[in-house]
Every structure is written in C-alpha cells, then in structure tokens.
Amino acid sequence: MAKQSVVKTKKRVKRVITDGVAHICASFNNTIVTITDRQGNSLFWCTSGASGFRGSRKCTPFAAQVAAEKAGRAVLDYGMKSLEVRINGPGPGRESAVRSLSNVGYKITNIIDVTPIPHNGCRPPKKRRV
C-alpha cells in the first residue's frame, strides 16, 4: 500500500480593515451592493437577485434591504466599523439599503450621491408608446 503524504498548506490570514466604502447601485430593475476597502479592492458584493428575489420583486426596497444586510454581515468578519456610502442610480432601493447598513451596526461617516448627471450630453431615447 502506498504511503499517504500530508501536504501542509499555509493558513490564509484575514486582513483587518476598520473602515471601507459601500457602493450602492440602485437601478430600476435591481440593486447591487458592493463593499470595498479604501483602495477600492472588493471585499463582498450582493444583489437583490442573488438574495433570492426574481422578476419585479428585485426592484423593491425590501429586496435592497435584504441585499445590503447580507453584504454588511459578511464583511463584519474583517473587523470593519465604519462605512462611507456612495449611492449611484435612481432606483427605489436607495434609502432602504443605507438604512439597513446602519442597522447592521456600521457607523456611516458620509453619504455621497455619485449618480452621473449629463450637462446636455447624449440625446435621450425616444418616449415609449404603450
């Protein structure tokens, strides 16, 4: 019988990150929550669709709340205490995602709206006729 060899692997050390940035992209169809460190390296992300909501339920404020809670609880292992929140988009899950991040236990330092606003740039698409 062959001798079994035991391979020692290095244990991965988790970094300690005290403050980070929560990027909330709230579109009309979905809400994406990404939590990064200060340099922009992604630590965890979650969407309304990945949280189990499908179809028209993805774009509700409750789905955004569940996605933000899921992302916030996953990053607690890094030792994160405070978050800067950057909100992008006009969707219905904007405020509820920020509120649920503060309910998880993070100290929110500032909230920035980074939605791009054109200074009369491209022509918008034509109006829908239903």
Curated annotation (Swiss-Prot):
Q: Which NCBIfam families match?
A: PRK05309.1, uS11_bact
How would you summarize the oligomeric state and partners of this protein?
Part of the 30S ribosomal subunit. Interacts with proteins S7 and S18. Binds to IF-3.
The organism's taxonomy opens as: Bacteria, Pseudomonadati, Pseudomonadota, Gammaproteobacteria, Lysobacterales
Gene Ontology annotations for the cellular component aspect, listed alphabetically: ribonucleoprotein complex; ribosome
| UniProtKB keywords | Ribonucleoprotein, Ribosomal protein, RNA-binding, rRNA-binding
**Name the record gives this protein:** Small ribosomal subunit protein uS11
What processes in GO biological process is this protein linked to? Answer: translation
Q: Give the function comment from the record.
A: Located on the platform of the 30S subunit, it bridges several disparate RNA helices of the 16S rRNA. Forms part of the Shine-Dalgarno cleft in the 70S ribosome.
UniProt lists the gene as rpsK
